[in-house]
Curated annotation (Swiss-Prot):
Primary gene name: psiA
Post-translational modifications reported in the UniProt record: N-glycosylated.
Naturally occurring in which organism (per UniProt): Dictyostelium discoideum
Residues covered by region (Disordered): 355-451
Domain PA14: 116-261
Example of a GO biological process term: positive regulation of sorocarp spore cell differentiation
PANTHER family noted in UniProt: PROTEIN PSIA-RELATED, PROTEIN PSIB-RELATED-RELATED
Protein name: Protein psiA
Amino acid sequence: MKLLIYLFILTFYKTIVLTQTPSTHLDVDITIYDQLPLYNNNFEPETGSLTKNLVQTTLGSDGLPVLNSYSNLTYSNKNGRMYSPELFKYFFAPNQISNTTFNCGRNFPIKKQLKLLRTASGNYIYDNDFFFPIDYEGFDTDPANRIYKDDESTNKTYHNYHFCFQFDNRFLFKGNETFKFTGDDDVWVFINKQLVVDLGGTHPAASSSVDLSTLGLTVGKVYPFNFFYCERHTSRSTIRIETSLELYCDKYDYCGVCNGDGSTCCNPITDCNDDDLCTNDVCPPSDTVIDPSLPISFYCQHHPTPDPLVSDKCFESVCNSTTGSWFLNATICVEKEGLINTGCDGNTGCIYEPPTQTPTETPTQTPTETPSQTPTETPSQTPTETPSQTPTCTQHPTPTPTCTEHIKTPKPTPTPTCTKHPKPTPTCTEHTKTPKPTKTLKPTPTPKPTQTPKVPQCGKCEKLSSCKTYCEKKDCDDCQRELDGYKFDRCKTYSCDPIKGCIKTDKCKQGNDPCLKPVCNQYTGFCSQERVVSDKCKCDDKGKKGFGLGIGIGINA
């Protein structure tokens, strides 16, 4: 029963669509991508000619044309003036970036509409021999970019000659529709995702037509219609579309563009900037439902930037949100009861082991010696030592002293010795009296705990020595590790302040000229200067573009 109802509704819908009275005009929403030859050298190349086979015969997975080759040495790319094939992806897709360097691929999306008028023949037509829809718009809001003129005219009229546009519509196939096009430069038309019009390259106006009855389409079925057009060279821009297709839009983005991507009303740089250089700011997905009372920034997304460093479980990658730079911090191994941290493994992390058991000297472990075995010493045999000769165990600021374990009665000797005490950690006992003659060993009672030497308190610019018995002065390397871990910032100078402790300051300092700001190369540490263009900068050459260069080498000490 449900199937019958569905078939009835579908038949009713098709009947209405097929029999409804056609409109006097057909409005087609388009997205124009303004281009600038500075940012994409595929625009304003040398004069070319009509070139087929620039693109593949099927649309890519993103619904856009795909070049047959991404080498600029192939015949089709050379003849079609595709100097930088890798930038072709920005012909019909947004690339709103802050980069303004040569061939960065930057473009400027703009929403427009084509109005096709219905003629007496029943076809819809758009005909324009001077197709310049974005003069003074996009990049050309800046007068410095209005440098391209109509060289064929006597008055050298300015126009915006560098742009591409595309639209993505649907149509219900009736069985006898046609599509005709005349224009320049590149034009590609795809019906049901298959290439049916192929007029690539920079060329004078060229024509192509399609009889849809020859494409193997099914009457009454809805198909996609994708149109792609580029104007890449002065001095003309021609376009003529004639079709009997009843094109319509099946969905709109939040900017009101048919099957748009949201780029005509959302710029990630200006609308989504969260001032965090450790995130990639993007506009919301095109199908996002936007509350008109809220700003577009409320719906922006902020994705963490990929970690460029090779980190493991012993080092953690950290990004500075102010500078966007990454550095490594050593993993801090927490203390665990009953275990000792012995290091770190990059795959498993912190390594813990039980403490080493120190042998305890008990009466049963002490060898029993008879008087005949025990060497007897008379006072004459006992070396007399003055206080200055008293053997002492002195701790020096060198590697931790090693204690020698004696299991037999030591013979008298002027050499200082360290007695092993039954504690987990070996310590050195200081002897200040002359040893008496050794008698027969008896079970030794458990000694009292030896007091641990007091750890000195170091100042802000001091650190404990390796044996933790005295303080040493911190150097710049100590401060660098304290402040930034294992990441050395070449643009900072590390030092120690007696009150504040370790500090770092900018290596590159502001000079006397307020219109030249210091710039540091984070890879080399070299200092240079850039000219400031600002209303607050009162200079004779205010507003002029340029740069100053100065090189300085700062050495951390």
